[in-house]
Amino acid sequence: MQITRESKYIIGLVLALGVSFATLLAHLFTKPSLEWVYNHHATPFFANKFMLGGYLLVEYLSFLLMIVPLLMLGDQVNDFTFSIIHTSIWYNVFVVFTVWAFTREKLYWTAFFSLCLFSSSFTMYGQSLRLRNGFVEMISMKLPSKLVFGKSLWFVVYAFSAALHCTGIGCRVFSNVFIWFFAAMYLVPILGFHDWALSLVSAYLFLSIGIGQMFIHLFALQHIFAFIIAGLMTLFAALLFLLPYRQRRAALTGESAPLLQDNNAGPAV
């Protein structure tokens, strides 16, 4: 019996997700635990762990949704879908190495693997943009790609700040400035591709940073800036979500204007 291409990708994805999730879960109970190491290495971009936990749970559930097009479409699955799933498998492999390095407090290796995670997530996000905006594609491919890309960009910044471990006054001032450049990194794809969903994802992440900084009280003003950025990202998401409807309404108004003028015009004398 020959195993189909779809079956191979389903098996590979389920195995990668299982190993990745089991690694995360197991290191919650090791010594030192994942939670202890994360709390011990608070940085200016330390995010609330409970909000991150909820984010990770949604992310793993969204990964499982990648199986949907393979089961529903069969031979009609395009190459971009297979490519996204293939990249997501590698992403979960890098998660295992990242957790291993982080729980052993090998922070420079953690920073290196964070770049591997970001590279994989960036590839996933770029490939997902080539898919059509159908409901199945949105929940099964685009949503996981946006969640992974948003979190990976945050984790790169957190991992490098943890590796450098600079807590002096100069670093604190730099962090208060850099958080705005960090927000601008999200705005490039958000505004470039009119991605309201990614804007919501980034708003959630900045909100978690704000709450995390508010509780640890290590870096002055950082939580205030994070809350402001979260509000701005939410506003951008709302505007980008409504933009197609406004454009469609403007187009319909423009098309109906000549007809109204013709109807209002009197007969030629």
Swiss-Prot record:
The keyword Transmembrane helix applies. InterPro entries: DUF1774_fun. One of its GO terms (cellular component) is membrane. This is Uncharacterized protein C637.03. It is found in: Membrane. Keywords: Membrane, Transmembrane, Transmembrane helix. It is a multi-pass membrane protein. PANTHER family: DUF1774-DOMAIN-CONTAINING PROTEIN, EXPRESSED PROTEIN. The chain crosses the membrane at residues 9-29, 50-70, 82-102, 107-127, 147-167, 173-193, 200-220, 224-244. The lineage of its organism: Eukaryota, Fungi, Dikarya, Ascomycota, Taphrinomycotina. Pfam families: DUF1774. It comes from Schizosaccharomyces pombe (strain 972 / ATCC 24843).
